[in-house]
Amino acid sequence: NNRRAHHRGIVDECCFQSCDFRRLEMYCAPAKPAKSARSVRAQR
């Protein structure tokens, strides 16, 4: 009696059953360019 059966989230995809890294990555924000917050702070 799961009403959200059609809407599977990251837990359904990768915790209750295994998934590959590429599928796991789809849930994450894209990688940012190499500049870190530390280097930006040092310039001020």
UniProtKB/Swiss-Prot annotation:
Residues 1-8 are annotated as: C. Residues 38-44 form a propeptide. Keywords: Disulfide bond, Growth factor. One of its GO terms (cellular component) is extracellular space. InterPro entries: IGF-I (IPR022341), Insulin-like (IPR016179), Insulin-like_growth_factor (IPR022350), Insulin-like_sf (IPR036438), Insulin_CS (IPR022353). Residues 9-29 are annotated as: A. Residues 30-37 are annotated as: D. PROSITE patterns: INSULIN. GO terms for biological process: cell population proliferation; head morphogenesis; insulin-like growth factor receptor signaling pathway; negative regulation of apoptotic process; negative regulation of release of cytochrome c from mitochondria; negative regulation of Wnt signaling pathway; positive regulation of cell population proliferation; positive regulation of phosphatidylinositol 3-kinase/protein kinase B signal transduction. Expressed in adult liver. Transmembrane segments: none annotated. One of its GO terms (molecular function) is insulin-like growth factor receptor binding. Disulfide bonds join C19-C28. Belongs to the insulin family. The insulin-like growth factors, isolated from plasma, are structurally and functionally related to insulin but have a much higher growth-promoting activity. Acts as a ligand for IGF1R. Binds to the alpha subunit of IGF1R, leading to the activation of the intrinsic tyrosine kinase activity which autophosphorylates tyrosine residues in the beta subunit thus initiatiating a cascade of down-stream signaling events leading to activation of the PI3K-AKT/PKB and the Ras-MAPK pathways. Binds to integrins. This is Insulin-like growth factor 1.L. The gene is igf1.L.
